[in-house]
């Protein structure tokens, strides 16, 4: 009995870093490591950036907790992480005065405490500095088996969803067209 009790903390410690594991492209998918010669700004509305969510976690009726997550800031951080391999420079909109491309992001999440699964939906809309919309993509992601480290699991789920939108931007050719326009200027 004591042996079984001691193994759980060891397993939790071993799998704690799994939430930060990046998603690898499947067969036929384009790799995100492109480093196109673009300066990309990630933009969010002030309301979305200020979003805080309240989640309830219950571990088999033995442990209950309520947790506030600054989800707006987490969404922006995940978008910056996911889009970084695509281009030379990625910064929040307010930190980049003259971007070549602006991507406005939005994300929403739902946590199922009984199944311990995070569900995430994201939208990424690309704009030229002139304000012209060039493309908009949506993606979803989920991660299950979340017993601890909920915020890291939520962030990795957002990163996976934004990586999917990044693949859609690449596959549509939108980023390549903007990079060619920028290099010809």
Where is each model-derived feature located?
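Sec-dependent bacterial lipoprotein signal peptides
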Residues: 1-18
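Extended alpha-helical regions
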Residues: 1-2, 93-98, 182-185
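Small side chains
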Residues: 9, 17, 124-126, 166
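A structural "domain/chain start" motif
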Residues: 18-76, 174-185
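Surface-exposed short loop/turn segments
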Residues: 19-27, 86-152
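Short secondary-structure boundary motifs at beta->alpha junctions and helix caps
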Residues: 60-68, 130-179
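Extracytoplasmic/secreted envelope proteins and their assembly/folding machinery
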Residues: 72, 76-80, 84, 121, ...
């Amino acid at each position: 009995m004591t042996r079984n009790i001691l193994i759980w903390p060891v397993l939790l410690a071993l799998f704690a870093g799994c939430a930060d594991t990046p998603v690898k492209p499947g067969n036929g998918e384009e790799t995100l490591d492109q480093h196109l010669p673009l300066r990309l700004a990630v933009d969010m509305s002030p309301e979305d950036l200020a979003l805080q969510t309240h989640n309830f976690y219950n571990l088999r009726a033995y442990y209950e907790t309520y947790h506030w997550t600054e989800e707006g800031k987490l969404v922006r951080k995940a978008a910056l992480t996911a889009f970084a391999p695509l281009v030379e420079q990625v910064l929040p909109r307010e930190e980049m005065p003259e971007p070549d491309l602006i991507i406005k992001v939005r994300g929403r999440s739902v946590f199922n405490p009984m199944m311990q699964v995070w569900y995430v939906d994201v939208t990424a809309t690309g704009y030229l500095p002139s304000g012209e919309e060039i493309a908009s993509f949506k993606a979803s992601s989920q991660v299950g088996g979340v017993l601890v480290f909920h915020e890291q699991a939520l962030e990795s789920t957002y990163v996976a969803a934004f990586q999917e939108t990044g693949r859609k931007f690449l596959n549509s050719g939108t980023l390549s067209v903007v990079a060619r326009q920028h290099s010809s200027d």
